[in-house]
Amino acid sequence: MSDINVVLAELKRGVDEVLSEADLIEKLKENRPLKIKLGADPTAPDIHLGHTVVLNKLRQFQNFGHEVIFLIGDFTGMVGDPSGKNKTRPPLSREDVLRNAETYKQQIYKILDPQKTRIVFNSDWLGKLGTEGMIRLASNYTVARMLERDDFKKRFTEKQPIAIHEFIYPLLQGHDSVALEADVELGGTDQKFNLLVGRELQKSAGQKPQVAMTLPLLVGLDGEKKMSKSLGNYIGVTDAPNDMFGKIMSISDDLMWDWYDLLSFRPLTEIAQFKEEVKNGRNPRDVKILLAKEIIARFHSEADADTAEQEFINRFQKGAMPDEMPEFTFEGEIGLANLLKEAGLVASTSEANRMVQQDGVKIDGEKVEDAKTTISASTHVYQVGKRKFARVTVR
């Protein structure tokens, strides 16, 4: 039992909820490879650091000898997951889904062991349900139970439309667990309802219910909302090392600790020691550099991490980038000159244009050559001259 306690403690690290822990202990006691499921709808072509929180947990299960099933929702991706959404998500075409799925398959192996990963597509069984099967599946849940879900409840109360296919989505995801006979399903905290539907459907099918394991959502570069490509507050796992380094160094000191908790493989005791050192006067930038290097080494190499650090020092620290700077958020695309003016970095758009012409404007340490640049969804550090800095998020 002591071995199980050690394994359980490791598996619970960074986890928000385990439903239920008693079920997980019982499954671990069976001393067999458990089927660990993670589903992902390929709604965008790139995987970002937010996705890696659950992928890292999958890899941990692999290291303990369990069978990892990475489910690509090529069928459900055409439906659109409503989790956490305040409006109906537009479904993707099959062509978009399949194109994005190919990219997913390449990128997940930056974390998962390809020899120990089984990739499946849920169209293999959901595509065969037919009308009769879909009606039978829908009969497992009532509209009242669906409206217990927070996002549906909010939209219903605010008289926002909820499409019928959005009610179907949790049932399709739950049916995936039945088809795979999953022992454990991982997901973000916004997936809790869907994971619990899987437990219910497995019980109805005469299977032992899966353990639902939820992990916190990684907050993006803006320090406010979950990391998302659509919000521009993300770091892709295929981003260049220098870009990764600059973006990680741009996050706030408070957010850095959340990222350590969710992204770092360092022992918890070492992270606690870092916190104590910063509390006692150590520059948090030094600790942030260690986080940046750890993440870059994982997706590129240690040599790339060292080079990116040196490049950052050459670009930023010699320019004395401050530890703290003003932060701004703008909605919708905005011209660079207007952004600099609204962020208080220049007095007018004409001054912004003049500073660009004089090589006095930088974005993440890179000189800007075109004053007519339009800034879309993103988070960057903007510098004007030697001493004016601002962290700006465009959504």
UniProtKB/Swiss-Prot annotation:
Top-level taxon of the source organism: Bacteria
Principal EC category: ligase
Entry binding sites for ATP: K229
Motif interval(s): 'KMSKS' region: 226-230
Compartment(s) of residence: Cytoplasm
GO molecular function, one term: ATP binding
InterPro entries: aa-tRNA-synth_I_CS, aa-tRNA-synth_Ic, Rossmann-like_a/b/a_fold, S4_RNA-bd, S4_RNA-bd_sf, Tyr-tRNA-ligase, Tyr-tRNA-ligase_bac-type, Tyr-tRNA-ligase_bac_2
Major site of localization recorded for this protein: cytoplasm
Alphabetical list of Pfam families matching this protein: S4, tRNA-synt_1b
Keywords: Aminoacyl-tRNA synthetase, ATP-binding, Cytoplasm, Ligase, Nucleotide-binding, Protein biosynthesis, RNA-binding
Keyword Nucleotidyltransferase: no
Catalytic reaction list: tRNA(Tyr) + L-tyrosine + ATP = L-tyrosyl-tRNA(Tyr) + AMP + diphosphate + H(+)
One of the record's GO cellular component terms: cytosol
Record-listed E.C. numbers: 6.1.1.1
Motif ('HIGH' region): 42-51
Residues covered by the S4 RNA-binding domain: 334-394
Reported function: Catalyzes the attachment of tyrosine to tRNA(Tyr) in a two-step reaction: tyrosine is first activated by ATP to form Tyr-AMP and then transferred to the acceptor end of tRNA(Tyr).
Family affiliation: Belongs to the class-I aminoacyl-tRNA synthetase family. TyrS type 2 subfamily.
Subunit text: Homodimer.
Protein name as catalogued: Tyrosine--tRNA ligase
